[in-house]
Amino acid sequence: MKLKIYTDGACSGNPGKGGWAAIILDDSNQSSISGSESNTTNNRMELMAPIMALKKIKKKSEITIFTDSKYVKDGITDWIKKWKVNNWKNSNKKPVKNKDLWIKLDNACLKHKVTWKWIKAHAGNKYNNLVDELAVSKTK
């Protein structure tokens, strides 16, 4: 099965009340999931969206995930390999922030063939705009 997933996270204050959302698309269906946390950060919410979307997909699938977070896209496609080798330390030898969520995201990706695409936020992409509105609504 081929799927597209649009994800976003938002935070009212940083830290503050946060929301995450994902829209999952296949050839004929569209579904959305979302959630919130009280004392969190925007980066944690950006990570929660793809984690929760991937958890929802039970069948092994070919998935393209669209995110407007370079933190998530670069982290999962590049930085995580180095973090694992360096015992979860970043290039400054400091512990990687949000390690718990990076591990969850990495594990969730193993079940599928995942391609990551960065898209510019607020640039007129229909699904990016929808997922942004949904994530922001969860911060209220």
Regions found by a protein language model. Give the residues of each.
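RNase H catalytic domain
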Residues: 10-17, 52-130, 134, 139
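RNase H-like nuclease fold core
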Residues: 1-44, 55-57, 132-133, 137-140
